[in-house]
Every structure is written in C-alpha cells, then in structure tokens.
C-alpha cells in the first residue's frame, strides 16, 4: 500500500510540509496555528490550520479509508499545550500525517483534502488570460515567495494589533475602517481589501500601483500617507493616516457650492498635490470630490490612488479608459492617448462643481453626458470672477494640447491670475489658514463621515482571517499576485 505518486499523477501530485507554527490570541484564548506549505507544479502557497482542523480532517478520512491506518498526534488532556517541545513534537506528527495524504491519489484528490489544502482556490491557478508581454518579461527562475520589506528587522503587523471601531468608507474591493492601534492608542484609517475580489476582477496591478504611489507620498502635505501595509492569505491591509474632516463631496452636498475664495484655496492645494505626483511621473486619473478629504484643520488630502498610472513623464501618454464619468476628459472618452493634462481637466471639473454645485457637463444619461463633454461648449454662469471664468475655460479645453498645463504642467497653473493672491510657498507650508474648519472634537471624531457607512457593523472577518491565516510582514508569501505588498516603515517610523 505504501506507494509514491506515479507518473500519471505527476502533474497534480502536491508536495506539502509544515515549516513552522505560531501562537495566536483571539478573545483571550490562546491557540497554535500551523503553517502548511503546499506546492503543486509551479504554484506554491501557504495554508494556516489549527490542530482542531487537522483532527476534523483525520476523523473524516479514517472512516472512509480505514485500511490506510492514518494517524495524527493525540489530543493532550493534561500538561501545557504551549510547551515548545510539545508543539515541536506535535508539528512533526502533523507533518507526517499530511505527507501520507499526498502519497495516495485517492486521498489528495478527495474533496476534504483539497479543501483543507486550498487546492481549488482560484488564486492558486494560473490565469490563461495573462498578457503574453507579462509572461515574457517575468523572470523564469525568480521565486514567488519573496516580499520586498525594506530594511530588515522591522516588526510584524497583523489585524489583531488593532481595535476596529467604525466603518468610514466603502469601495469595490472592501472597506475603510477607523482603527485604534492597541500598542499606543493611535488612530488610523485601515483600508481592507478582499484578495479574492481583486484577483477575480484582475485588479491586482491597480492595488500594487496604489501601494507604490502611497510609498512616495510621505513628504507631501496634501497626499494621504501610508504608515505600513500587510496581508493575510485572504485580505490586504493599508494602514493610512486617519483624516477626519470629511470628504469634499460630503461638504459640497451639504452646502451646494462654495464661495470663490474657499474654492480657490481647495483648488490650489489640489493642484499642488497633482503637481507633485506629476513631478514623480504619476498621473492621478481619478480626481473627484469623493477622493478629496479635509483634515482636522480644513486642509485638502488626496486619497485613493488605485487608478494612478506610474512612469508617465510630461511628454508621455497612455490609453487606458478609466476614471469617473462626470470628470472624464474628452481624449479619454475617445480612447485616444492622453497625458498629465487629464488631471488638469479633472481639476477644472472639480473647481466648476465647487463654484456651481454640479460638474460642468453633467447629465443623468451617461451617453448624453459623454456627448456633452465631447461637443457642448462650456456654460459659465454669472456669479464668479473673470479670472475664475478664465481658468475654467483653460482647464476645460477639449483639445489637450491647448489645455492649461499642456506645456509646463503645474507651473502654468501656479502662474494663472486666478491664484495671483496666493503664496504657493505659504500654501505648501500650511501657513494659509483654511477658509473652513471642520471643528472635529478629537482624533476619533467621525461626525464628518456619512452615516450610511458609520452605522454599518464592523465585519469580524477584518480582525482575523476565517482560516486563521495570519501572514506577518516578515514571512514568506506564496501568492504571486501580491508579492511586495507588505511594507514595513523605515527606522524613523517604526511602529513598535
């Protein structure tokens, strides 16, 4: 009966091992989690299992395959279950158990075993639609399990480091939560994304682009900062600045429009942030009031960098159709090559909305709105200054080559008469008092967030993965799609 995988099963025969175990705490209970490394063909991944899950699988299989004499280490009734020698011995016994499972095709092809090892998970199977360019440029001998963590020796991060207090936002792939770090009581916005949804929609490039852009935001006052990121086998976590003055969209809805000096102030801070992104060859591509936050003092903070395009210099173009319909530039709708000037179009659209209460070419019918953007002249109603009219006309120029910012990018925006009364140096140093104070009561005040979000129940699953599959920032990660996601801060920003 003792036989290894024969040639007929060579393609699907898994290789398994338990390289390590870790102690975890949940609701004041301690338990040991065993990390199972699974390899099938060129794919590798980790599965994190408790002893009880091994025991459940064992009891299921021994009834169906009594002749195979499977065994696992017995439960310990007396003594310390967390004694290092005991855990080492138990891990060896569990390792022997799973080694026996993969020696027999009838066992490793059994649904219970495949589920235990997550062999049918979509994220462990190659994607036949992967671009040929991506395949050809990938390194054939590179390991899939290395994470770029920055300086070595940085501490681990995991969901249980936080108390998740409130839902404060929601997107296509997950939620944004207000979280309090247990170590020091500091508040953060933690963006939690479901890997499964990201992978199913083939959006991992956008997620990694968002991470990369966030890492470059550290030194700009009007861009949200990433403190660190980490992952479990099911979720991705961005630990971000908690900015609690509310979305510009929230305040616009409440006030309908802003006085021109207030709109000018916000437009200047937004332009400064966009100019910085352009200087490091990043096009933002998704400027809209929902992505513009106010901090506790009333300064602008841009967030949500999922649609950013990296590596675009002032003379470069790209062609991807993306963004939000109300704010799309004509060249994007036409699917023509576009460049940095799409961001200046969006700035014009947001400035128009701040002054007049609606985007410039808004229509409930999206097709008609696209037609308006492409062909309808800009309607500038009374109530704003001549310089405001001028900058709106120049930013919302349908020909990108004639648009304000086409030649010298942010410098042209800075030099426009609309901003003549501003000192850009004082602006970046936050020496200009904001025209509106959100009047937040403290670092955890959520009054400026929509009750649609804050009244939601915080999902328990964000605190611990359902299969106890905690992946610290220092462990090897076997998911190709998110290699490099985990990020630990440089030494001056250590969080432990």
Swiss-Prot record:
Mutagenesis / variant outcome for changing residue 90 to A: Diminishes binding to phosphoinositides
Residues found modified as Phosphothreonine: 320
Matching SUPFAM superfamilies: Protein kinase-like (PK-like) (SSF56112), PX domain (SSF64268)
Reaction catalysis annotation: L-seryl-[protein] + ATP = O-phospho-L-seryl-[protein] + ADP + H(+); L-threonyl-[protein] + ATP = O-phospho-L-threonyl-[protein] + ADP + H(+)
Cellular compartments per GO CC: cytoplasmic vesicle; early endosome; recycling endosome
InterPro entries per record: AGC-kinase_C, CISK_PX, Kinase-like_dom_sf, Pkinase_C, Prot_kinase_dom, Protein_kinase_ATP_BS, PX_dom, PX_dom_sf
Activity regulation, free text: Two specific sites, one in the kinase domain (Thr-320) and the other in the C-terminal regulatory region (Ser-486), need to be phosphorylated for its full activation.
Sequence ranges assigned to domain PX in this UniProt record: 12-124
Residue ranges, compositional bias (Polar residues): 139-151
Known function: Serine/threonine-protein kinase which is involved in the regulation of a wide variety of ion channels, membrane transporters, cell growth, proliferation, survival and migration.
Subunit structure and binding partners: Interacts with GSK3B and FLII. Interacts with PDPK1 in a phosphorylation-dependent manner.
Tissue and organ distribution: Widely expressed, predominantly in the heart, spleen and 7-day embryo.
Keywords per UniProt: ATP-binding, Cytoplasmic vesicle, Endosome, Kinase, Nucleotide-binding, Phosphoprotein, Serine/threonine-protein kinase, Transferase
Protein kinase domain residues: 162-419
Entry PTM: Activated by phosphorylation on Ser-486 by an unknown kinase (may be mTORC2 but not confirmed), transforming it into a substrate for PDPK1 which then phosphorylates it on Thr-320.
Sites bearing Phosphoserine, chain numbering: 126, 129, 486
Residue interval(s) of motif Nuclear localization signal: 195-205
Protein name: Serine/threonine-protein kinase Sgk3
Binding site for ATP: 168-176, 191
Tree of life domain: Eukaryota
Similarity comment: Belongs to the protein kinase superfamily. AGC Ser/Thr protein kinase family.
